[in-house]
């Protein structure tokens, strides 16, 4: 005959078995992909694209479309690149310093102008279309004016870099503010946010995805403007990527010229991936946005 103590012990034993079963299931859950697998999954498409580009490049050289001293293949170009890598890195430092300095100033100007235009109907009516017009204007068209105003100097390049980047930054912020949900602004007003607090805690965070897109585009315009400027405005004593590109072209050293082009391309890719790509991923995670590039 079962006693109450025996029944209680049986129930306790059954509960222990069920809990241990749950623990077993929990420990047996399949783990996610390893870090190496994640790195490989992210890297192989890029590596494949590089290999395909190199193969196509070499096939074009082999086709005899141009003599190999005019269009060298990957091997002599990479030999020139690694053979003089220190010089290219020094030149890249000069170019990047110019680029970041101009972009930082454009960031300040573009943010201020974008915030004012987005929140002021009169300003939007007066200069809204002008900002878009400045954004579409080729950077090379500014250099004659820049040289007239600032002579052949760093300021001439700085002037064009700022004009290349600021309109895109301003338009990115304007677009982000225009697409803010009205309920967020009403909630900020109810909670007592006014002017600067409204902009700092409500408007800017809500507009951040579009604003970062504007920053990314602004950097692209700044980088293109900068390299165009270094090809046109040659400053003695300032060894830059643009100057090195022009010198190699003048000397007919086309392998070295293309090596500089590769350095310029790699810098553009790295800045986009490490700076803007990282910012975009963090914003997507923070705002719960879907990564359209995934799956």
Which role fits each region the language model picked out?
Residues 101, 251-280:
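A membrane-interface signal for the N-terminal entry of alpha-helical transmembrane segments
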Residues 132-168, 175-176:
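Generic hydrophobic transmembrane alpha-helix motif, especially the helices
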